[in-house]
Amino acid sequence: MIGMLRGKVWEIQADKLILDVQGVGYQLSIPYGLLGKAHPGHELILYTHVILREDELALYGFSSAAEKELFLLMLSVSGIGPKAALSILSTLGIGQTESAIASENITLLTKVPGIGKKTAQRLILELKEKFKGRAIALEGIEGAGSLPQAAFHSEAMETLLALGFSQEEAKKALQALPDSAQALSTEEQVRLALRSLAATK
């Protein structure tokens, strides 16, 4: 099974890209957020998942292990296929998806193309308990109602928690970021947050 690929972007298509790995081109479906950042010749490391069907082998790529894990969790829900799971990640990102499920926010989930009320209810019913703690960690982050900002902040929050900071420390550091940080990558947001944390030590 292919668990990870490292290579250069060869071609970008409507909803896929081709990754050149030592002369072999792998076609992967990836979230739109990642697709928008990819450029031909740019090196990417993707966490991957393979889905085998009778007439097709489909490869999906993700920017982090957490993104892949969420994709697989959604696939475990009855009625959620890879297209729907990828659409949710593309529209909401990791943080907003987890927060919407944990808070039973059907309205937000049904904003995703192809996700109706019944599908949103199934997602909530089967997955909400898994995300209760993570939703608490996201509470109080400035701009949490904004899809792009919350998505960036949630991934930065997860990174800071993984580095050993408490929820309170991470939350305060992210709240202190300027509004312009919304346009930054997760790595850049984490770097700014770490500077803020170092200054308070």
Swiss-Prot record:
SUPFAM superfamilies: DNA helicase RuvA subunit, C-terminal domain, Nucleic acid-binding proteins, RuvA domain 2-like. Its main location: cytoplasm. Residues 153-201 are annotated as: Domain III. SMART domains: HhH1. GO terms for molecular function: ATP binding; four-way junction DNA binding; four-way junction helicase activity. The gene is ruvA. Homotetramer. Forms an RuvA(8)-RuvB(12)-Holliday junction (HJ) complex. HJ DNA is sandwiched between 2 RuvA tetramers; dsDNA enters through RuvA and exits via RuvB. An RuvB hexamer assembles on each DNA strand where it exits the tetramer. Each RuvB hexamer is contacted by two RuvA subunits (via domain III) on 2 adjacent RuvB subunits; this complex drives branch migration. In the full resolvosome a probable DNA-RuvA(4)-RuvB(12)-RuvC(2) complex forms which resolves the HJ. Gene3D superfamilies: 5' to 3' exonuclease, C-terminal subdomain, DNA helicase RuvA subunit, C-terminal domain, Nucleic acid-binding proteins. Keywords: Cytoplasm, DNA damage, DNA recombination, DNA repair, DNA-binding. The RuvA-RuvB-RuvC complex processes Holliday junction (HJ) DNA during genetic recombination and DNA repair, while the RuvA-RuvB complex plays an important role in the rescue of blocked DNA replication forks via replication fork reversal (RFR). RuvA specifically binds to HJ cruciform DNA, conferring on it an open structure. The RuvB hexamer acts as an ATP-dependent pump, pulling dsDNA into and through the RuvAB complex. HJ branch migration allows RuvC to scan DNA until it finds its consensus sequence, where it cleaves and resolves the cruciform DNA. Has three domains with a flexible linker between the domains II and III and assumes an 'L' shape. Domain III is highly mobile and contacts RuvB. One of its GO terms (biological process) is DNA repair. GO terms for cellular component: cytoplasm; Holliday junction helicase complex; Holliday junction resolvase complex. This is Holliday junction branch migration complex subunit RuvA. It comes from the Bacteria. Residues 143-153 are annotated as: Flexible linker. Belongs to the RuvA family. It comes from Desulfitobacterium hafniense (strain Y51). Residues 64-142 are annotated as: Domain II. It is found in: Cytoplasm. Residues 1-63 are annotated as: Domain I.
